[in-house]
Amino acid sequence: MDKNKKLQSKRLRRRRHVRNKLRGSADQPRLCIQRTLKHFACQVVDDQAGKTLLSASTRDKTVRDQVKAGGNCDAAALVGKLVAEKAAEAGVKTVKLDRGHNKYHGRVKAFADAAREAGLQF
């Protein structure tokens, strides 16, 4: 099997495994993340209503001014703090972390740790 196809199949299996366990609700919405080479983004989703409650990204003006590059651990940690602050304003205290096909390592771990430190509970 080609190396890229093998990587893709592993990611798809991991995404399905994680996503089958998670369903966001109004009292405990789903915090899904998107990690690219240049940026890091997340959104808090209520799956029952089918609505996005809030979002944060390295593309936001407040984050963009503070970081040099959007695709590193420092930027992900800053997004974690920002989403925790926005969640507190919106009245969301606990969420379910949906890491998708990403391993809990590096930027994903930095994001989760920063969000926990800022008061968001997983």
Curated annotation (Swiss-Prot):
Residue ranges, annotated region (Disordered): 1-25
The answer to whether the entry has keyword Electron transport is no
Q: InterPro entries from the entry?
A: Ribosomal_uL18_bac-type, Ribosomal_uL18_bac/euk
- The keyword rRNA-binding is assigned to this record: yes
Ranges of Basic residues composition bias in the record: 1-22
In alphabetical order, the GO MF annotations are:
5S rRNA binding; structural constituent of ribosome
What are its GO cellular component terms?
cytosolic large ribosomal subunit
Please give a single GO biological process term from the UniProt record: translation
Which Pfam families does the annotation name?
A: Ribosomal_L18p
Family, as annotated? Belongs to the universal ribosomal protein uL18 family.
Q: What is the protein's given name?
A: Large ribosomal subunit protein uL18
Q: Which organism is it from?
A: Rhodopirellula baltica (strain DSM 10527 / NCIMB 13988 / SH1)
